[in-house]
Structures are given as C-alpha cells and as structure tokens.
C-alpha cells in the first residue's frame, strides 16, 4: 500500500513537469564580433523616458523596427544582428537626449528628443530638425499606408501631428505636417475653444476620415471628431485613471489599443466605443477586464489581427482583434519576463520575446529571441481553444486598394468553405459606414472534392449617400473625399483560427485617376474639307484681331493682333460649327480607354486665347436661376492672374441651389454654365476662325476628379462685316431703287418734248464725233 501511494504521489508530481513544456525556443543573435574593441558611439546616446519598454515596427517594411528602453536600437533586419545603441549627432545640440515619442513616417523616423522633433532618414543616414514648431512638444502621431504608388496612400504616410500632452485642450499647441515631419504648421480646428478637459492627444483616423482629439476630464476620456457627422457629438467616455499609451494597429481598420501597467482597452471604430479586453478560458469568461486579473502589464504588441500582452508576473496573454469583440487567453506561466523584454510579431501567428543583452567586450548589444508558434501552442487541450469552423476564406480583393468615384459601384467576391457539419456566419463590415455602404449576398457555389459545400459571397459597395437607406444626418458630406476599409471575417471565430486571417481591402471614396473626358469629334473641319490636316501640322498659325480678344479675359479689346500657333499634336483637327446655329460640345466620359457615358453634368467653357466673340443662349433669368449665377469674370478676379482657369467643382455654386442666397441683381447677364438641367448653348458672333476652348466639369456631384481638357472648334459660314452700318446701307439701296424707277418713267416722257428732241440731237452728234475721232486714232481717217 505504501508503495502504491508513493507511485501515485510521484505521478502527481511529475504531471506538471511534463505539461510545462517550454513556450518558446530561445536563441541569441551575435554577429560581427571577432576581436574586442573599445566602445565608441558617435553622438549622444538616446534613451526612452518611460519605465516600460516599447517596440515600434514599420507596418510596411517588416524588417524595420525601433526598440525603446534604457537603450534605443534601430534595426533593419528585425534584430537578427548585434547593434550599437542608437544615438543622435552632437551637432544637433539636443541637450538631454531623452526620447518621449517616436513614429515611422514613410521613409523617415521621427523622434521627439527633449521636447523637439527630429527627422532621421534611415536610408540616407541623415539627421535634421523639423521646422515650424514654436512650442515644446512631447508626442508625434501618424499612420502609414502600404499600397505603394497611390497618391492618396502617400498622403496618409506624409501626415503627422506633433503636440504636448497635458495642456488644456482649448489652449493646446498642436502642429500638423504633410511632409513626413520635415515642416510643421499650426493646426486649427473649429469649436476647439469650446472643448473642456485636458488634452490627451490627437490622431488621424484615416479609416474614418476624421481627426480625433482625446479629451481627459475627471478620470474619464472621450474623443472629439473634426468633421460631419461626428463633429456634433463625442465618442462614448471610458476610464482613464492614469495616462494610457495608444497604439494604432496597422491596416487602417480603425483599431486602437489603450494600455497602461494596470489596464488594457480596445476600440474597433477609431475611439467611438472603447471596451475592456476580456480574459477567457475556453468559452468561459474569467475576467471582464484584465484589471481584475491583478497583473502588471509590461509590453503590448499587435499586428493587423492579433494582440499579445507580457506581464511582470511572467504571464503571456494572446488574443485576436476580432470583428465583434476582443479577448485574451493566458498561456502557461514560465520565466519569460525581464525588465528589458519586449514583444514583437514577426508574422501571422509568430511572436517573439526580444531582450537586448549587453556585451562587456563590445559596444554592440546582442539580442535574445524567444520565438513562439501560436498555432502550435493553441493545440494544447488545456487551453480549450476549440476547432476552427472554417477551412478556407479567400477573396481576390485581399490586401488591395480600390477607388469608388461618385455614382460608381464596386463588386467584390469571396469564397468560404466551412468544416463538414459546421455553419459559420460570415460578417462584412466597413470602418466608415458614414461614407461607404454595402450589400452582401451569400449563396452555395458547388462542392469540393471532399464533399464540402462552397459558399460564394457577393459584396456590392457604393457611397452610403447613393444607397438611399441612411439618414442625411448619418452620412458624411458627399463633396468630401473619404476612405474606408472593408473587412470580411467570421462571426464568433475561434481563437484557434490563427491562420484564417480576415480579408481586408482599402477603399478610397474619391477621384478615380483612370477617368478622363473626351470631346466627341466625329464631324471635324478636316473631314468636310474646310481645313487641310497637312497644313495644320506644318507649323500652322493664325491671327486673332485685336478687337476680338482680351489677354486678361475681361472682355476688353487688346492693343494689338495676336498670332497663335495651332498645337495640332495636342488638339488634332478642330470640330466644325456653323456660326448662326447655337452649339454645345458632346462631352464623353472614358475610363481605362473605354467609353463610359455621355456627360450630362454641368460644365463651363473658356476660350484660352481670350476670344470673347461668343455668348450664351440663356440668361440668368431664362435659365431659372434663383440667385445670381457665377461667371468667368468673378471667378478670374477671385483667383487672380496666376490661375485664370480655376473654375472647378471645388468653387462652383449652382444658382439653383436653395442654400445659395446671392441676390439675383442682374437677371439679363449671360448664363455661362452648360449641361445639367438647362438647354443652354454657345452662340457665336459673325466671325469665322478657330476657337481653342478649356472645358471643366464643375458639377460637385458628378466626380471627385477635376475633369478638364482642351479642344478646338472651327466656326464657319459668317460673311465679312460691312464697312457701313446696315441701317445706312438699307437707306441708300432704297433711295437708289426709287431713283431708278423715277428715271425709267421720266426719261421716255421728256424725249417727246422740244427740249427732249434737242437733247437727243446733242447726244447723236456727240456720238458721231466720238466715232470719227476713234477712227482717226486707228489710222482710218
């Protein structure tokens, strides 16, 4: 019996030892060390002011990262080699080399050192101080977009805020840069003077197309937003009993992570709703908040879909940043924490605990890495992670960027294959529902070789405004370009679905750069033989009379004639228009070389050489204007001489807009807008010649693009203007006709009188003398 008890006791003592297998494999990175050297670090060695360690990874350049602790390290190979502590040149004269904040902005690293911002170009190894900041700052914030080659994406990476945390929000000095931090300018926001509380930070929430100000008041915090419709209210308040570090998860999904030593919060909608992170064991909730776990958080790491937490109690927590909620599970306790340790995701489901190691013989630090395979760890039955219900989730739109212009629609498809017997529910969401609306339909789409059912998901996207299902107070302004991220995930997805990433795509609701307008030119002047295309290509030029043009576009006569070289390579052969028939061009919309539609939106024309020998068929009154319409004269005066062709969708206001209250003082002025709801046309003066027109689509509801082009028209059929006024010509012709009639009547009457006979004889004798004289001249007399 005693032997049996000893065996049982031994078994119970051995079980924990067997189950406590190491969480990770430890390896030490040591490179470039052969012979001992004296420590030589150029410049002032930087250090991080916080007692905690941080690691900032570049979201686009995965091998680039910055370690912030008692030493600072910048790596270009994810710490796969020994590194010398990061330093700043003494020539920068930073004083105390204390770093309070850092941010990767595209191809540069921004550091706040001793309350000033410095820019380090890590590719060129060049330091410079930012300009434009006149007050002390403590933090910089920004985001990065990884879709290279897109101008809209580049704007995201270039945008940076600099600020001092802790001032009253109404008096805080905030600076903004759109040049990756090289140049800053003072940032102003409407109604900021009305806000109450301490300033906790400012962030560009690109996935929501908003700028958010964090307000802290009496241990509670909330976000204030910059633009309609969120600028009329605040985000829901959340606990803020101590300063929280804010981490913006990569991917533009609006995920924010707030953490301190004792708290961890997550927002999936750019701060509108901030929630505590639950701690689970299987399907059971252990704690509704990590605060109740009574741990001290040391390091937090996140990628697009995952979250990891390391505590000073040697606890490692892992969770997914799901579409519905976020929760953590705790792995087995092991000796993995140290004061210098920090967490770092290297790939999906791959986590490393990084610790720098000082070398007494070399200035360069080595790095110890403890690598964890999350998927392998979750297979431990004690974790009760469950089985992933989905075998496959894929879509052609994953990690791509699309553009939706006004009146456009985008169709996306995805494929889901569940495990046999499982019925998972796919969820589609957008980060900015105020701008982008969606409609999703799921249907069966055949079977796999194993007999599993394939499900096809069809997603339709277009502006929320055009769906017609949302209240106008909910939708963002249709005139403002916005951005949104679409995410396809599985509802209540098990934490074991590590490799089953949500499918995301970035949607720019703005200008489609593939669009352009073309003027229809089926019946050109060359086609009808009016102009010779060979002559037009042979350095052709023409003269514009000084009475017909104004170089200042004000309708005043010029002082001299103008010779114009015709750019045939750009314009081709001109359109043909008869001067006496009201005319307007046929404008076509093309995209990627394909015809889309005939443009019916409002547009304006302006002759590029200043010709003013044309007008319009409608006036402000006959066009039905309720307000004084804009015209080229007023637009040009507002723009100045530097931008004569500046009438576009940004500054156009329709005279039919009920919100436009400019009084209609001059109802008889020409109405200079073509297209739209009117039948307005161009009326040419009695003048033949070439007109080169600039055309601009000004309708703000047609496209976010500045759709502009130039084209030429040849006006024909006009007779030359008479020297005398037509009234005088008519009077003279009438008088000559009446005189001819009177002479035709009077001459026969006079020939039968005595005076008439004498006159007739006079003319006969005169004729005979002239005849005789002419004969003598020819030598016949």
UniProtKB/Swiss-Prot annotation:
Protein function: Auxiliary component of the CatSper complex, a complex involved in sperm cell hyperactivation. Sperm cell hyperactivation is needed for sperm motility which is essential late in the preparation of sperm for fertilization. Required for CATSPER1 stability before intraflagellar transport and/or incorporation of the CatSper complex channel into the flagellar membrane.
Positions annotated as glycosylated: 231, 294, 458, 473, 539, 631
Stored InterPro entries: CATSPERD/E (IPR028751), CATSPERD/E_C (IPR053814), CATSPERD_b-prop (IPR053813), Ig-like_CATSPERD (IPR055451)
Protein's UniProt name: Cation channel sperm-associated auxiliary subunit delta
Alphabetical UniProt keywords: Cell membrane, Cell projection, Cilium, Developmental protein, Differentiation, Disulfide bond, Flagellum, Glycoprotein, Membrane, Signal, Spermatogenesis, Transmembrane, Transmembrane helix
Subunit structure: Component of the CatSper complex or CatSpermasome composed of the core pore-forming members CATSPER1, CATSPER2, CATSPER3 and CATSPER4 as well as auxiliary members CATSPERB, CATSPERG, CATSPERD, CATSPERE, CATSPERZ, C2CD6/CATSPERT, TMEM249, TMEM262 and EFCAB9. HSPA1 may be an additional auxiliary complex member. The core complex members CATSPER1, CATSPER2, CATSPER3 and CATSPER4 form a heterotetrameric channel.
GO BP: flagellated sperm motility; sperm capacitation; spermatogenesis
Extracellular-side segments: 21-725
Cysteines paired by S-S bonds: 24-370, 60-146, 145-153, 388-497, 511-705, 526-573, 625-655
Cytoplasmic side: 750-781
UniProt membrane topology term: Single-pass type I membrane protein
Family as reported in the entry's similarity comment: Belongs to the CATSPERD family.
Gene: CATSPERD
Residues in the signal sequence: 1-20
Species, as recorded: Bos taurus
Localization terms from the record: Cell projection, Cilium, Flagellum membrane
Membrane-spanning intervals of the chain: 726-749
UniProt KW Cytoplasm keyword: no
GO cellular component terms, semicolon-separated: CatSper complex; sperm principal piece
